[in-house]
A protein has these predicted regions:
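Caspase-like cysteine protease fold
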Residues: 417-423, 476, 480-541
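Structural motif
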Residues: 303-305, 405-410, 431-435, 466-468
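Short acidic/histidine-rich active-site segments
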Residues: 464-477
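Short, conserved loop/helix-junction motifs that constitute active-site signature segments
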Residues: 351-353, 422-429, 461
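Charged helix-capping and loop-helix junction motifs
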Residues: 421-425, 447-457, 483
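Domain-scale, conserved, charged regions that form catalytic cores
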Residues: 2-347, 353-360, 371-383
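Short acidic, S/G/P-rich loop/turn micro-motifs used as interaction or catalytic elements
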Residues: 309-313, 364-370, 412-417, 438-442, ...
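Functional beta-strand-loop-alpha-helix junction segments that form "active/interaction loops"
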Residues: 360-425
Length: 541
């Protein structure tokens, strides 16, 4: 039973994640250290490298034992909740929830079928989306403005992303009635797929997570502010102290019916008793929490780990996350601990980013003219150095990643075709925003493997945060998302000293024309980060 040895069970579930990626990290970091030693001809300098306390080369990406793992969880800031979703060799889905205030909760969620209908449905939606994008050559962009019939206008000066992607040059011409009908059909199909994805996400939560869905959320209360409530609840003797604490922490997020379902799930998880808890008892517990608890006002985060074969699913858009939408992904908890170690024991999160120390690469292939036009207007608000329409050299990329605090790429894919192995050879200081189709998609290679992704190279290079796309979207849509994210980061500049990147992403997602098909494709891996607002905008001095 998971409740009998919670720390041991949690240790094994968490330790099982991303073994191949962690081995790659060990190999690359050792290679960096070896290269650093060989490049220093001075014997004393070589010995200094060997004796260095730099955690990067010596980090082994594993936990020594259960006690080591427990000590790391207990050192987490209270605003951080770590949730590990794992898939065992029998295709059973498990959730492991860890927080510094209580012992872990391990829940057996569901057994996935060999050809699971949910995964099949997601593949169907993405295949239809890809097909609609590829067929959309020379389709004008839809405007937010309405015509006299209440329908969206079609913009003549917008062109379709795949025409640019395939390097096809078509003569400029005014849209004909046939073109406008094609555009109407195209955007009708995109909106239909967006609605399908919305329904799918709700079904995903219901069928795979069920009553356990609230466990994805961080605490809504601070325990030190609610000690009297905990004491009163302990006197009832219905639940264990960890379970009572968890029920208190999540009460303010969910309806009473959802809370009762969660209570029963947790009780079944910690006892083999088939006796139901009296409804009056549950109502009394709920009343004590409702009347006596104090809800916290601070922003909290969920660090979410999912296996590679499930990484293409839009977990961040599950309905339950509407209550606390700040979600950061990780390949494994080891990567979070590695990034924190490299930041010399981060005392507070989010990590602050100086927006004035930025660099961008825009349309290096030179074939995304409309994207270049749109984004040039956007970056023109800032005093950022960058490259437009030209391929950066490896030295330029290396300097951008090491000396800047924000790196923005807008082009095809992740940009890896241009700088190859440069990222893995660098110690990356810059939060990296990769706005290209499938830029941080993890390509599944089967059970027991961690897949392939440019994402891994950035995280191994100690990139604090990587933002990118999980699947294909049109250039116009993702350009709009990038613009909305920038606008959200600037909002309330007179009243807020910092702005969460994750908060800006959430709001940009909601303001998308296609909040699921486009908005849900953008996710963030790594540490929570925030921009210093007074440093982000160009100063007129």
């Amino acid at each position: 039973m998971p409740h009998e040895y919670p720390w041991t069970m949690a240790f094994y579930h968490v330790e099982s994640m991303a073994p191949s990626m962690r081995q790659l990290a060990r190999t690359l970091l050792l290679r960096k250290k070896t290269h650093k030693i060989k490049s220093n001809k001075d014997i004393n300098q070589q010995q200094e490298v060997l004796d260095s306390n730099d955690p990067a080369p010596t980090h082994n990406f594993t936990f020594r034992d259960t006690d080591h793992f427990k000590s790391l969880i207990e050192r987490l800031p209270p605003e951080i909740t770590f949730v590990n979703i794992s898939l065992d060799e029998e295709n059973v889905l498990w959730m492991t929830r860890c927080h510094s205030s209580i012992e872990p909760v391990i829940i057996r969620l569901s057994k996935l079928e060999r050809d699971d209908p949910m995964l099949a449905k997601m593949s169907e939606i993405l295949e239809s989306s890809d097909l609609s994008v590829r067929k959309s050559m020379n389709i004008p962009q839809e405007s937010d403005e309405k015509n006299e019939n209440g329908e969206s206008k079609i913009l003549d000066n917008e062109i379709e992303r795949d025409k640019e992607h395939l390097h096809i040059k078509l003569p400029e011409k005014k849209s004909t009635e046939q073109d406008l009908q094609k555009a109407k059909a195209f955007w009708g199909e995109r909106k239909r797929l967006d609605e399908q994805l919305k329904v799918f996400i709700g079904d995903l939560q219901h069928k795979w997570l069920g009553a356990a869905a609230p466990l994805l959320l961080p605490p809504a209360v601070d325990l030190q502010d609610n000690e009297r409530v905990v004491t009163r609840l302990m006197g009832l003797g219905v639940f264990s102290i960890p379970t009572l604490t968890l029920l208190l922490q999540l009460y303010h997020y969910i309806s009473e019916n959802e809370w009762i379902r969660l209570s029963k799930l947790l009780r079944d998880n910690e006892t083999q008793s088939n006796r139901d808890i009296a409804h009056t008892t549950m109502s009394r517990i709920a009343q004590i929490i409702k009347q006596g608890s104090i809800k916290s006002s601070r922003k909290c985060y969920t660090l979410l780990v999912v296996p590679p074969q499930l990484s293409h699913l839009p977990w961040e858009c599950l309905p339950i996350f509407e209550q606390s939408p700040y979600v950061m992904r990780l390949p494994s908890f080891h990567i979070f601990e590695y990034l924190c170690t490299l930041e010399q024991e981060i005392k507070e999160l989010p990590k602050m980013v100086n927006g004035r120390k930025s660099f961008y690469v825009l349309n290096p292939s030179g074939d995304l003219s409309n994207t270049q036009k749109r984004i040039t207007d956007f970056v023109g608000q800032f005093n950022w150095p960058g490259l437009v329409g030209e391929v950066p050299t490896r030295d330029q990329i290396r300097l951008a990643l090491t000396e800047s605090e924000l790196f923005l790429y807008i082009g095809h894919g992740s940009g890896g075709r241009y700088w190859r192995s440069t990222v893995r050879e660098t110690y990356c200081n810059a939060v990296s925003i990769l706005m290209g189709c499938s830029s941080i998609k993890i390509y599944d290679e089967g059970p027991g493997f961690d897949g392939r992704s440019s994402l891994y190279e950035y995280l191994i290079a100690r990139c604090p945060c990587v933002v990118g796309c999980l699947w294909m979207v049109t250039d116009g849509e993702i350009d709009s998302f990038q613009h909305n994210t920038g606008q959200e980061t600037q909002n309330n500049i007179k009243t807020e000293s910092i702005k969460l990147f994750t908060e800006a992403i959430v709001k940009a997602r909601l303001s998308c024309k296609l909040p699921y098909l486009t908005g849900a494709s953008v996710v963030a891996y790594g540490l929570p980060v925030a921009a210093a607002m007074d440093a982000l905008l160009k100063l007129n001095v």
